């Protein structure tokens, strides 16, 4: 199927496959009405085959051969009418920039060699020129395209596919990957080349020339190595490329440890804080409060929990590291001049569900930044998963593909950053800086106008989608949209761009752009985002099968066009790359207010915690901005290092005499576990049935899983691949397989990212944290208080689900011992942190209770005991200061993180624990909603920040605020009434209460909104809570003056 052939929809279970023609039929070439050249006025002429000479196959603009060749040699090399780059035609010489066209069998004209010289070269047995040309042609053509042996999509029509409804002929070629690697399977996809021999093979002349060529190469190698007979190599014969080769052999990345002057004091303070914490808890346990045992016991339980939580969070940050990448070495190693790029291919996944909550313009910018990435276009394929089967998403993607033909060449011509047009044109910087091209300003202005028109078209589609027709959506050709019922529709695939038709305005190829919507039927579990990502894994394996995959949320665009190259510096490094399962990039965000009121940037986690994990076994997977190794997602174990010598032991102890297992934990043979692939000898040990039970019943997909270096399986026709692609996204494909259990994104939690990374680390893989100077990806964050709390609620609920699942880090993964202990601490902390909301809520209530009752959580302390409290506070602040020192996090970002830890802990985390317990104990499932992505407001950039949206998550923090404020008023009033003696004990209680209020201050500002006016709903809640505590106040009666007089028992007065 060609890129413009149309939408393919089908269901494997129902044996249906239909081809729906797109919105517009392919435009025919312009009719050649005349035979006069529009440039010089001469006749156009004919080709050597007698056909009319056509210079441009796109528009058919009449140009004669001399003008055509002159324009290619001296001019712009573009058609004067449609501006498409002229391709080399048979009989014309090659010019710089031409691609390798395999269907042109025209060597003498291609290299501008006349017949006499060709004959002379054939008769000259010492002339090696033609031999080198033949060799160059052989290597060049073996690196590109598909030959006629594999089928030519433009000439060989495919047989019609019979469906349950109708028979539709499917013709054309599906744009399959040419070579996604350099493994043994890749070569079988290339065109079979018949070189042009200078003489008949097998003759003496051929053998003699081959021997001469071999001798010359051997002598050249010896001279470079300095072993030529007669002494050392001549300095004049020194090869200038040797230093470049030495540089290319260097590591592509290196680990940079934090300076010891920064990290050693930090570790010392951690140890001191641990010691002080032990003495502090010992003192608190041994000194109860007799008249306030419930308050004392509650505070002790909370403080012990906080201590355990701090240990789990702190010690995974013991080995923080930085990393450096060397992009120039990557290019020297895999991108040599004059040779095809050897960089591995990458499949990029973009997931979206609801276009009304995830605006199509946001998704379009993400897709445009992918298509314009700085990476070989034949190595990039973009798959967009539309899990809502929305026609709006489909149409907007079609518009995006058309706009990409203009946007991509503009980005690459002027090397602009970022390559998402919305954010490029909105950035407030000097766009003329470092731009010396004379036409830049003019073309930038024109491109901005083109983008504004593109936005108008997208917004028109969005406006049209607001009113759904009663009969459902109808495509422009009159066909009903297959996804009108979002819960019951066939699988759909549409290729918008690709090698068979995806060219930009300058005639250069564009990366593939594929629309995918998996099949959904009632009664089948779809597993939300994790299921959609697994469907993308399978369909990409069938169509392109790149060895690496990058997944992005629809609102995360590529901010650094070299981001993929940064990841390849780790994944393709010969020394350490084979054990790396994924490269995680930090999340950076646009559109956040300057003070980051609700800690949206999450800098403490991304710049401190993740750096610490990188020094252990690698960072956790955070759901987006991550480049995966495909083999790791298939459940394979990492390659093993050199085996140690076997230890000679007796069989007296069962642990020493165990029989070696034939299969690993995941049921993989040792050949797979050790090498990531299958040995030819051991391949027969695992039957096809076992593979299908693991990966599913698709022969094409199962074959692709055995290809570690990627590439499309050999002998695959476009029709078969198309049918398999529909098959692997069918709703019942995963039944009775390991998908979601051991393969791909793991099911069982709405935070599938944590589970997926955890499974990989348990198998022994390690991950890498990459922080380039320019942020690799940027996204949008919910700056509204209610949206932010709902987002945190979803994360916390996912952690609770993992804690109660069979993959809980407390119990899972001990058998193989591949997960390091500090890494396990981090995963345990990731799953239990929502439970901290219970002690945190109790601890934040204690100050108000103490102020209202006149009691406290600890007895009066001595001077010596006060040293424990002073030392504890100093160690807490010292740890934070030293963390900020080695990480570069500002004090404002650190403080915002502390504040939102309390805000989220007493609201979203608390609700997550309750919902998680209801789901586990009562089976009540809670559906999460997709966080809305804002498109921006031209009138006020932060209008969403001040918008008030009521949610039940606001009730607990509001109650805490009012309770502590009432407590402060009551405590001060009591001290005023009872004299100066009450101020001493009151100071500790007030400090405790103000600690809670200060941490909840951003929440209070969020309630006040822009006008500093409390909303009505909050006023009602405040009055209600105030009434309740007023009744409590009357019961306590703190304002009654307590009489201080003689004891009646002593004076004998009968009162």
From Swiss-Prot:
Q: How is the cofactor bound?
A: Binds 2 Zn(2+) ions per subunit.
Coiled coil (UniProt feature) = 439-468
The main location is: membrane
Hey, which stretches end up on the Extracellular side?
290-291, 853-860, 921-951, 1005-1013
Q: Which reaction(s) does the protein catalyse, per the Swiss-Prot or TrEMBL entry?
A: [(1->4)-beta-D-glucosyl](n) + UDP-alpha-D-glucose = [(1->4)-beta-D-glucosyl](n+1) + UDP + H(+)
> Record's Pfam families?
Cellulose_synt, zf-UDP
Q: Which segments sit on the Cytoplasmic face?
A: 1-268, 313-831, 882-899, 973-983, 1035-1055
Positions annotated to bind Zn(2+) 2: 56, 59, 79, 82
Residues engaged in binding UDP-alpha-D-glucose? 351, 357-358, 387, 528
Per the record, the pathway is:
Glycan metabolism; plant cellulose biosynthesis
The record's CDD domains line, in alphabetical order, gives: mRING-HC-C4C4_CesA
Stated EC number for the protein is: 2.4.1.12
Biological processes, Gene Ontology terms: cell wall organization; cellulose biosynthetic process; plant-type primary cell wall biogenesis; plant-type secondary cell wall biogenesis
Question: For this UniProt entry, which segments traverse the membrane?
Answer: 269-289, 292-312, 832-852, 861-881, 900-920, 952-972, 984-1004, 1014-1034
Q: Where found?
A: Cell membrane
- The glycosylation sites are 927
Please give the Gene Ontology molecular function terms for this protein: cellulose synthase (UDP-forming) activity; cellulose synthase activity; zinc ion binding
UniProt: Zn(2+) 1 binding residues: 37, 40, 64, 67
From what superkingdom does this record's organism come?
Eukaryota
Binding residues annotated for Mn(2+), in chain numbering? 529, 553
Q: So what family is this one in?
A: Belongs to the glycosyltransferase 2 family. Plant cellulose synthase subfamily.
By what name is this protein known? Cellulose synthase A catalytic subunit 9 [UDP-forming]
Question: Can you name the source organism?
Answer: Oryza sativa subsp. japonica (Rice)
What is the primary gene name for this protein?
CESA9
């Amino acid at each position: 199927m060609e890129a413009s052939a149309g939408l393919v929809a089908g269901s494997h279970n129902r044996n249906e496959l239909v081809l729906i023609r797109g919105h517009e039929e392919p435009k025919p070439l312009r009719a050649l009405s005349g035979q006069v050249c529009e440039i010089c006025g001469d006749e156009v002429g004919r080709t050597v085959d007698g056909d009319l000479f056509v210079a441009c196959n796109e528009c058919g603009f009449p140009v004669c051969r001399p003008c055509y060749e002159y324009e290619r040699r001296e001019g712009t090399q573009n058609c004067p009418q449609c501006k498409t780059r002229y391709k080399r035609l048979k009989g014309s010489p090659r010019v710089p920039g031409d691609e390798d066209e395999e269907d042109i069998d025209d060597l003498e004209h291609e290299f501008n060699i006349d017949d006499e010289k060709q004959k002379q070269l054939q008769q000259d047995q010492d002339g090696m020129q033609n031999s080198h040309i033949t060799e160059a042609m052989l290597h060049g053509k073996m690196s590109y395209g598909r030959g006629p042996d594999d089928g030519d999509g433009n000439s060989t029509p495919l047989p019609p596919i019979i469906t349950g409804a109708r028979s539709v002929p499917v013709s054309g070629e599906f744009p399959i990957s040419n070579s996604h690697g350099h493994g043994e399977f890749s070569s079988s996809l290339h065109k079979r080349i018949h070189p042009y021999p200078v003489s008949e093979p097998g003759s003496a002349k051929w053998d003699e020339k081959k021997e001469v060529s071999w001798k010359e190469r051997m002598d050249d190698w010896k001279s470079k190595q300095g072993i030529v007979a007669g002494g050392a190599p001549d300095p004049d014969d020194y090869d200038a490329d040797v230093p470049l080769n030495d540089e290319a052999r260097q590591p592509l990345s290196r680990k940079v440890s934090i300076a010891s002057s920064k990290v050693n004091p930090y570790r010392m303070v951690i140890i001191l804080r641990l010691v002080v914490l032990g003495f502090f808890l010992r003192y608190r346990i041994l000194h109860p409060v007799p008249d306030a045992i419930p308050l004392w016991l509650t505070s002790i339980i909370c403080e012990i929990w906080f201590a355990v939580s701090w240990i789990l969070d702190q010690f995974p940050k013991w080995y923080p590291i930085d990393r450096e990448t060397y992009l120039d070495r990557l290019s020297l190693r895999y991108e040599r001049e004059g040779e095809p790029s050897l960089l591995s291919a990458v499949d990029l996944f973009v997931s979206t569900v609801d276009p009304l909550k995830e605006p199509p313009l946001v998704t379009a910018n993400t897709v445009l930044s992918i298509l314009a990435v700085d990476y070989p276009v034949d190595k990039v394929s973009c798959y967009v998963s539309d899990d809502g089967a929305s026609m709006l998403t489909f149409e907007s993607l079609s518009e995006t593909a058309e706009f990409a033909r203009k946007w991509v060449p503009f980005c690459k011509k002027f090397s602009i950053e970022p390559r998402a047009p919305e954010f490029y044109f909105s950035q407030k910087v000097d766009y003329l800086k470092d731009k010396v091209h004379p036409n830049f300003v003019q073309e930038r202005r024109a491109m901005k106008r083109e983008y504004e028109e593109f936005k108008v078209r997208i917004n028109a589609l969005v406006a049209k989608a607001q009113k759904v027709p009663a009969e459902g959506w109808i495509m422009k050709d009159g066909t009903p949209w297959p996804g009108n019922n979002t819960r019951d529709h066939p699988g759909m695939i549409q290729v918008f761009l690709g090698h068979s038709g995806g060219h930009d305005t300058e005639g250069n190829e564009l990366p593939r752009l594929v629309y995918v919507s998996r099949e959904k039927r009632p009664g089948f579990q779809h597993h939300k985002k994790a299921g959609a990502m697994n469907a993308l894994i399978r369909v990409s394996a069938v169509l392109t099968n790149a060895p690496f995959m990058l997944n992005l949320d629809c609102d995360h665009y590529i901010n650094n066009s070299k981001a993929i190259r940064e990841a390849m510096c780790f994944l393709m490094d010969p020394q350490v790359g084979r054990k790396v399962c994924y490269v995680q990039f930090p999340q950076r965000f646009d559109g956040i207010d300057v003070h980051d009121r609700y800690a949206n940037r999450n800098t403490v986690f991304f710049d401190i915690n993740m750096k610490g994990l990188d020094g252990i076994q690698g960072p956790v997977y955070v759901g987006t901005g991550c480049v995966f190794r495909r083999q790791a997602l298939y459940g394979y174990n990492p390659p093993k290092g050199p085996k140690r010598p076997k230890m000679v032991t007796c069989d007296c102890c069962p642990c020493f005499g165990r029989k070696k297992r034939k299969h690993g934990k995941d049921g993989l043979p040792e050949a797979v576990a050790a090498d990531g692939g299958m040995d030819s000898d051991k391949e027969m040990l695992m039957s096809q049935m076992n593979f299908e039970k693991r990966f599913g019943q698709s022969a094409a997909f199962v074959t692709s899983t055995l290809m570690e270096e990627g590439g499309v399986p050999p002998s695959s026709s476009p029709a078969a691949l198309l049918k398999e692609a529909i098959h692997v996204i069918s709703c019942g494909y995963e039944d009775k397989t390991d998908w979601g259990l051991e393969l791909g994104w793991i099911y069982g939690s709405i935070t599938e990212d944590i589970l997926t990374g955890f499974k990989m680390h348990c198998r022994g893989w390690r991950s890498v944290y990459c922080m380039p100077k320019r942020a690799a990806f940027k996204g949008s964050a919910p700056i509204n208080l209610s949206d932010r709390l709902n987002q945190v609620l979803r994360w916390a609920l996912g952690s609770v689900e993992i804690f109660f699942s069979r993959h809980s880090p407390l119990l899972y993964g001990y058998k193989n011992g591949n997960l390091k202990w500090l890494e396990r601490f981090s995963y345990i902390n990731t799953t239990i942190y929502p439970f901290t909301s219970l002690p945190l809520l109790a601890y934040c209530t204690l100050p108000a209770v103490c102020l209202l009752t006149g009691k406290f959580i600890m007895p009066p302390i001595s001077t010596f005991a006060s040293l424990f409290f002073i030392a504890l506070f100093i160690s807490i602040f010292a740890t934070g200061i030293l963390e900020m020192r080695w990480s570069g996090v500002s004090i404002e970002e650190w403080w915002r993180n502390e504040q939102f830890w309390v805000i989220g802990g007493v609201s979203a985390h608390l609700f997550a624990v309750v919902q998680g317990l209801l789901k586990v104990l009562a089976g009540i499932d809670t559906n999460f909603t997709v966080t809305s992505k804002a498109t921006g407001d031209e009138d006020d950039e932060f209008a969403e920040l001040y918008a008030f949206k009521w949610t039940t998550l606001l009730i607990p923090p509001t109650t805490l605020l009012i309770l502590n404020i009432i407590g402060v008023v009551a405590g001060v009033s009591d001290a005023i009434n009872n004299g100066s003696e009450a101020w001493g004990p009151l100071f500790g209680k007030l400090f405790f209460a103000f600690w809670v209020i200060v941490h909840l201050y951003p929440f209070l500002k969020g309630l006040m909104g822009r006008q500093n006016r409390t909303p009505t709903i909050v006023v009602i809640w405040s009055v209600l809570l105030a009434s309740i505590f007023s009744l409590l106040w009357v019961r306590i009666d703190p304002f009654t003056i307590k009489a201080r007089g003689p004891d009646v028992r002593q004076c004998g007065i009968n009162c």
